[in-house]
Amino acid sequence: KVHFPISRIDVMDGSRRSSKSNAYFSGLGKNKRIALFDTLIEKHSVDELLSIIAHEVGHYKKRHNIKGIVLGVVQTGIMFFLLSIFLNNTGLFAAFKMENLSIYASLLFFSVLYSPIELIMSFVGNAISRKHEFEADAFAKKSIETGEHLINGLKNLTVTNLGNLTPHPLTVWMSYSHPPVLDRIHALFD
């Protein structure tokens, strides 16, 4: 129904390492695949699993993997550009009253001064990731023609993974790559 060319759906033996459940989409070109943890399959109904798979297909259809790669390349490019500015920068050494240039000192300066930039980029990356999750949820709802099964699946995932239903908004903004489940459920009701 959603025209998703996939070579296989893998079942990951996650129960050996954890009781948590998960599913993910990965791959490019002809090597696309969806992986479902065995714990996910054990604890969810067929309808919930179909909606979770539709959510993962949504990531593909909305090109979230490509956008993630582009974002990663841009972030890495920014890091290397800034690193090139810091390496053996005579003005930086003069500001710290250092007479001799040192690659080690340059790397130390860079790591200290780059940290706030990296923090800001992580906030941006998390915000984009949360937006992608809402988009994949909406795709699943449209594909399955109901959000009910995905809502039930999200509830089960939260119970299984001991998720926090009401995290502080600042915590979400700073560190969550996925929106809180209650926000996702509210969005699916709209």
Model segments located where?
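Polar-ligand-bearing catalytic/cofactor-coordination segments
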Residues: K1-L101, S115-P116, I120-D190
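Alpha-helical transmembrane segments
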Residues: F109-V112
